[in-house]
Structure formats: C-alpha cells, structure tokens
Amino acid sequence: FVDIAGLVKGASKGEGLGNKFLSHIREVDAIIHLVRCFDSEKITHVNSKINPADDLETIKTEIILSDLGIIQKKLEKGKKKLLSDKEIKILEEKLVFLNKGVEAKVNNEKEEEFLSSIGLLSIKPKIIVCNLDEENLSSGTNYTSQVEKKYPNEKIINICADIEDQLSGLD
C-alpha cells in the first residue's frame, strides 16, 4: 500500500499536487479512494464542506481528464505510425467513453496490457473506503448513503480510521 495525498480539482492541469499525484498513482496496481464520511469541527475539510460523493466525482473527473490527455498524445503519435492500427482503434474506442465522462474499461487481457503500458488510470481496479466515526461505523451515515447511491457498482467498505489508528498503536 502506498499512501498518496489527496487530489484536488484541476490536478490534470497541474493544480495542487497535480501531475505529481497523477504520476504516483500510475505506479499502483489498484486505487483505494478514502473519503471522509463523518462530521467533526476539529478536522477541517479541504472544500470547507463534507461531500464524499462530490470528492469522488472530482477524482473521477481528474482521472478521466488525465486519460484523455494521454490518449490524445498517443493518437498524435499513432498518426506518425508509432502505433499499430489495432492500438489506434482501441484508443479511439476509449476516447469515445472518456469524452462522455465515463471511465475506460478493458475488454480483454491484451487490451489491459496495452492500456496499462501507456499509463491509463481509469482502467485500474478501485475500492471506495468510507471513513466513519466510531458511533456510525455499523449503521453508516447520510454521507455513506450518498456514496452508495452515486456509485452502486463500486466496491465500498466502511471503516473507522481512528479505531484502526488506535489498534495499530497497541503492542
């Protein structure tokens, strides 16, 4: 596991950690999105309000924008015959989905190998981890409900990172 600082809106254009963040997640095999799903006046949120569904949407958008940039550059090279016709076709298919705001999906192992080799992020397996406070861990919150509603096909796990942190300190 590699802990990489969060992504902010505009990262695909270099804002926040921007391209540094995106280059870090290119190296991982899967992406675990840890989103805050609890209220606390002691911990401020980067956007001043807690909305994990919006936080996830920001990440998804930035990943899609990054993938669009990668594919567009590769297609320009493809026109110079640096890619096979099959590779160009695959990229053009993925471009259609990405332009609609839909993450790229792979159809087979060879396609996955090719798309991974060029650094597409949207094809990586993902898990959403909702970080809750201890009292809502078993029941969830309105925030977890929003995440489940907006991402019904994603793997979602509820945890209390505070409890995990306390347990890790025990000898």
Where on the chain are the PLM-derived regions?
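Short, compositionally biased low-complexity segments
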Residues: 35-43, 65-73, 150-155, 170
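C-terminal-of-GTPase-core extension/linker across diverse P-loop GTPases
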Residues: 77-171
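ATP/adenylate-binding site constellation spanning eukaryotic-like Ser/Thr protein kinases
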Residues: 1-4, 68, 123
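Active-site-proximal flexible loops/turns
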Residues: 10, 43, 74, 138, ...
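Extended, highly charged alpha-helical segments
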Residues: 53, 58-93
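Switch II of P-loop NTPase G domains
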Residues: 1-33, 37-60, 108-118
